[in-house]
Amino acid sequence: MIQILELFGGIGSPRCALRNLGIPTKAIDYVEIDEKAVRSYNAMFADELPYKTQSVVGWNLKPDILIHGSPCQDFSIAGKQKGADEGSETRSSLMWETIHIIQQMGAWKPRYVIWENVKNVRSKYMVHNHNRYMDEMRKLGYSNSFALLDARDFGLPQARQRYFTVSVLDGNPFDFSDLIHTPMRNVSDFIDKDSDVSDYYIVTQPSMLSRIDEVSDCDSEFRGRVPVIKDFTMTITCKQMRCPNSGVVKISDGKYRYLTELECWRLQGYSDDDYYRALSVNPGKQKCLNGALYKQAGNSIPVPIFESLFRKIILGETAEVNTDVEIEAEQSGQLKFA
């Protein structure tokens, strides 16, 4: 039985991954401030933790793996980049609460700690917080490594790059180079037929229609533009209703629609059953887009990435070394490229 602690747990991506792998799991606690996300989590996992937790006393917990994806808004380019300095009281500075919790655990520190955050966490203005986080983890007995992982390398047709930092207690740095990757699936496997999608997903606002770009390469920067989905979507965000960064689906010449909430959940690796359980407790308004379920998808972490991490950490399953993956490991306080 693997015991996990989920901080900033959202809708439970790591727990979904463990479930999909058939690994017996006990969630000893789950911390999430969004009440609607808590509803979805408990609907998906049989109400094992039917309460919202906002504080954790570390010394009462004995997890094997601690997972945290602290708020990204103050790291993100899309936000105001306020940063995450300890004591700054920004949302992203909550990352230091994880350090405080582990400090309280004493001899019961988790064997593995996994932290996920946006690509901009390694930008020149933000990198000092990431480096200090790893330094604090090293003081607690952990070796650290991190890599930029893309959901497209794990089967999902979504361009979503995020840094994953894995800290190992009293062991060698985690090696990302032999993670099992999965070929990207066809985006049509995730998108419903237009005839099955309600008309209220059709883009009608002139201001939005004027921003749709069918020509540019989907890998290019789309500042102020909205891409048309071809081989894959761009990053699913929590603001799909207002600014569909992911792109829009072309119905016919000059006619487009938004991704549905269900499609966004699929593109993060969730099953249709997961989505419908969440919908049952967050039904939204009739004939309106469901902002809560869009937000939950946009704030989540791709389930297949956790599946690959857990296949290595727990099951010992690896692939041939991938020399194309850029990995950084902290050894004796120095960052080195592997």
Regions found by a protein language model. Give the residues of each.
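SAM cofactor-binding core of SAM-dependent methyltransferases
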Residues: I2-V57
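N-terminal Rossmann-like NAD(P) cofactor-binding module of classical short-chain dehydrogenase/reductase
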Residues: L5, I65-I67
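A structural signal for well-ordered alpha-helical segments within the folded catalytic domains
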Residues: G12, E35, W96, V127-N131, ...
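Short, well-ordered alpha-helices that flank and scaffold nucleotide-derived cofactor binding pockets
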Residues: C16-N20, A43, H100-Q103, D135, ...
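Short, glycine/charged-enriched secondary-structure capping and boundary segments
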Residues: R19-I23, A43-A46, G79-G83, V127-H130, ...
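Class I S-adenosyl-L-methionine
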Residues: G58-I65, F75-R242, K255-R257
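Short glycine-/small-residue-rich Rossmann-like dinucleotide-binding loops
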Residues: P71
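C-terminal target-recognition/interaction regions appended to catalytic cores
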Residues: P206-A338
